[in-house]
Amino acid sequence: MTIISFGKAQLSDSLRISVLLKTVYIQTYAIDGVTFEFANFITKRFSPEHIENIIKENPSQLIIAYQNENPIGAAQIIYNSHCPIRKTPVPELSKLYVLERFYGKGIGFELMKEAEQEVRKKGFKEFNLEVYIKNNRAIDFYKRQGYVSIGNVDFPMEHNTYENLVMNKTFN
């Protein structure tokens, strides 16, 4: 029997979460393969040690979807973020990653719902996210969840810059 559950990330899952994040990032963004710039970025940003630090800093900022206790998706909230367009403090959905084989099963929707509930519990009235301008699947998903585009920003890596769409949702 398959059991899907959602919960806050555990330190003991840091390695598995690291692999999950790297896998989804590669599947989504390695359009031209894994460049050195790309490899350097994901090696640092998604290392088990970096994941451990995120969990230690604030366990409620990393929500994990599990199938039979194995990570299949993740949502990361950055509470002390600022909207790059409006220049105001607003929490950011930094990541919403689901393994490709679990697309279409409501995992992303549930992770989004869990993240929004966490933000609302802390008294916030809105939520921002940035998404790669060419990631149409994600943009369409976010629009279906009530997010609207408020502008564009650049996402810098080592040698290249990538255009991201900034989206926002205001809670009633």
Predicted features and spans:
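Acetyl-CoA-dependent GNAT
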Residues: 8-12, 19-31, 39-101, 109-114, ...
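C-terminal "cap" of GNAT-fold acetyltransferases
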Residues: 87-91, 125-128, 132-140, 144-145, ...
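Short glycine-rich hinge loops at helix-strand junctions in the catalytic core
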Residues: 106, 123, 146
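Extreme N-terminal starter segment of soluble prokaryotic enzymes
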Residues: 2-5
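Short alpha-helical
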Residues: 12, 16, 136-137
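Active-site acidic-Proline motif in GNAT/NAT acetyltransferases
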Residues: 99-101, 105, 133-134
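Short acidic-aromatic loop segments in the C-terminal HATPase_c
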Residues: 97, 147-148
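Conserved GNAT acetyl-CoA-binding A-motif
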Residues: 112, 119-130
